[in-house]
Amino acid sequence: MVIRSVRHRGLRRFLEEDDHRGIRRDLINRIRNILAALVAAEDMSGVAGPPGWRIHQLTGARAGTWSISVSGNWRITFDLEEGQICNLDLEDYH
């Protein structure tokens, strides 16, 4: 899937320049693996990750937003629009 827009400044820098500033050092490898899986997949059914990623769609006010667990309360979240990843974010929404 194509990543169309990124909300988190550090995550954007990481994707565009491989610059880790703005991302906790202990999360970098896990984030790299998650992003690689998302880009390699044609759709969400093709995202193969370990059970610890806990891939799911949010409900309530954020219904339709996808979430993938990074570590502790940290999540990669994004929306899918026309098969493209939008509003990619790294956040603690708990």
Predicted regions and their residues:
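A short, surface-exposed loop/turn module that caps and links secondary-structure elements
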Residues: 42-66
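Short, solvent-exposed, low-complexity loop/linker segments
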Residues: 24-51
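Arg/Lys-rich, positively charged N-terminal/basic patches that mediate binding to nucleic acids
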Residues: 1-34
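Residue-level marker of positions within ordered structural domains that often coincide
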Residues: 16, 43, 83
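Residue-level signal for pocket-adjacent positions within structured domains
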Residues: 1, 9-10, 18, 42, ...
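Enriched for short, Lys/Arg-rich terminal
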Residues: 59, 66-94
